[in-house]
Amino acid sequence: MLWVLYFLTSLFICSLIILWSKKSMLFVDNANKIQGFHHARTPRAGGLGIFLSFVLAYLLESFEAPFKGPFVFLGLSLVFLSGFLEDINLSLSPKIRLILQAVGVVCIISSTPLVVSDFSPLFSLPYFIAFLFAIFMLVGISNAINIIDGFNGLASGICAIALLVIHYIDPSSLSCLLAYMVLGFMVLNFPLGKIFLGDGGAYFLGLVCGISLLHLSLEQKISVFFGLNLMLYPVIEVLFSILRRKIKRQKATMPDNLHLHTLLFKFLQQRSLNYPNPLCTFILILCNLPFILISVLFRLNPYALIAISLVFIACYLIGYAYLNKQVCALEKRAF
């Protein structure tokens, strides 16, 4: 029944943040940002509730690999801090933020086995290259979750599903407790958006999911490609965003409002549908679920997982092209 404790702890801390923010305006978000799709000044420190619940679990539980040890806790804290500073309006440059995240990930990888070198049937890597690739993957998935954190419940919903799937595969993991911490936050976030996850929460959840999946891969409970498939939507979103900005000769770190979820939001909004923000989340998670469930069935079959990922990428590109065309056409008519 400890999951009840962590669920309520997360819910309680997030509730306190909402009340405190109304008085101090400390954690409130800027509704005028280019990637913003809300109007009210809303606290964006929901990740603090999840992280402090994790700290409580760290003190009360006997953590096993891959979350065992002070350096793992230090690394997770550094990655959370890299985003939380932004949440309290103490901005870091994208370069400094990435460096802080990389240092945190190195702390983790240096103290617990997370380096995957065998990517059969595609390739294998020497240990040093695999070590660097592990850093790239963990920093990458942390930022990927942050990129899709645009609407109520989207990033947290994807992570909650991932953590519950991980628990299904490995019931001995702590992923179930982490999932309930996320759900405690989601009570206040979805559908009405009383509080946002924030950069710190998004980075932390992305890293936790990445660590868990690499660990399961090394334990040979899943193919390494299953981890990719489980988080494929945020991964494709960040890679496609980088490619899109490179084509436009923009900085890869420059924010914009051309993500799949923002196009879907505009599409729903143009059709005057009620509650387009939570509806956008519901549609995207519903579209992801079939691919996740099929991947679970083939979690040890790399060939099937690669095929599933290619089908998902094709669906993503078709969906993106359709939404972009529809949104542009309707915007032209408006003028």
Each language-model region and where it sits:
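"…together with the soluble PPM/PP2C metallo-phosphatase catalytic core" -> "…together
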Residues: M1-L239
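Cytosolic, membrane-interface loops and tails of multi-pass inner-membrane proteins
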Residues: L19-P43, F240-Y275
